[in-house]
């Protein structure tokens, strides 16, 4: 993944697929001019890294929380959210049903001036859980399941059942202030996209109703939270 200014490249290694479009990987930052290669983070595999418009920051998701790395400060890493929890709350990446329905794997953007982060949060605490059996298989072989099958449990909303509750949030990188954005949406509605614009005071959030027959686009100020 090339930075917008062309000075750096994010290189993924040890990639592990999560769902159809999502994956975890150990990312490295390659600096083109110096040919220097550095780990993006030492805290564990990352998901959905995004560059700031000036190429000086990278935001990513780990364990359902958002982290920020500042290249100008020795790749210093800070944690943005702390409420992420497996099978309960997801920040910055879609849950299974949103990824599958709307074909995306990242719900995290910078504003145009790189001063703020905005993302979608998925509260799946009330979604019912489903378990799959895992067998040895092939390509890849899961040797730990060669004798006895393992299990994989995740939140799987069937038709008519409760979906994740979605909301949009912003983070001021300088003040560390987190705010919920004011987006009109029914409790069972969707936010299938969050998009930055050339205006640092505007991001665009798409919303849909549960039946997916009404699409609205909201221009939101991430500082005032008003749409």
PLM region spans:
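Beta-propeller folds
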Residues: 1-227
